[in-house]
């Protein structure tokens, strides 16, 4: 594929899990040190993945409940979702299946989801857990289990602060759109054929 294709990629997840930081880290190679709820503008860039040039449109969303009615407006036309949770927040991990998957299936059925665990740098930071005794780390195994539970084609852990795996998140999102995983459901449909005698 040599022609440029537009891919709309929308980030979703609880407030303060690091969606905006992930986008800023990816697009500008910098890490914002202060938490400012969703100020990232839509961004577009030409990216080459596996020899294919795509125009990647990045859309940020607000995770806070105040935006529950407005947020789905950005889902229209999405090619892929990046569903983020914090690797140091059990609540954000649990909300993936409790809140976000039902919302995405309702407003954007069939759109692939890349599951992303953010704040990887803090998961092994002992001082962080001393300072935040209520924080619960999420393991890679738990992330992989959640990926299977929600049927996501990819799960990636990253750190916007250290930039570890940040590019990998967006490369995975592009790959999921350009090379969708093979669907296993086709065999099931053939087995469920109706016979009238």
Swiss-Prot record:
Keyword Nucleotide-binding recorded: yes
Entry's localization field: Cytoplasm; Membrane
Tissue expression summary: Ubiquitous. Preferentially expressed in mature pollen and pollen tubes.
Motif (Effector region): 35-43
SMART domains referenced in this protein's UniProt entry, alphabetically: RAB, RAS, RHO
Positions with a binding annotation for GDP: 160
Pfam families: Ras
SUPFAM superfamilies linked to this entry: P-loop containing nucleoside triphosphate hydrolases
GO cellular component term, pick one: cytoplasm
Covalently attached lipid (S-geranylgeranyl cysteine), positions: 194
Propeptide: 195-197
Function: May be involved in cell polarity control during the actin-dependent tip growth of pollen tubes. Inactive GDP-bound Rho GTPases reside in the cytosol, are found in a complex with Rho GDP-dissociation inhibitors (Rho GDIs), and are released from the GDI protein in order to translocate to membranes upon activation.
Subunit details: Interacts with SPK1.
Name the record gives this protein: Rac-like GTP-binding protein ARAC6
Organism annotation: Arabidopsis thaliana
Gene: ARAC6
